[in-house]
């Protein structure tokens, strides 16, 4: 990823402390029936989480204009949470990658915060973009 535009989406630079991306990582997104778009950037050799599992991740989230609204990389600390307690796009998307893997998600508003947004950082009806490294599955 770089600070360029693809399909009118601005991508911020890859966080400096992010792990490596597979050399054969896809350049194009795949889509699920729900409308979630994703690219598995590093497959990961471990277990895929289910909605009842707790995951530990590093992530960066940005809007379609490239503005980063949240980043565990920038805070220098990963985060753990039950996969059932996050937006639908995360719950669905994280099941597509194994422990140790990295995925890029493009989450439509109906799988994110919808019409309400999330405070000042995420406006209503925003498509959200995430780079997520799945560190552990518990």
Tell me what each language-model feature is.
Residues 1-138:
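Cross-family detector of peptidyl-prolyl cis-trans isomerase
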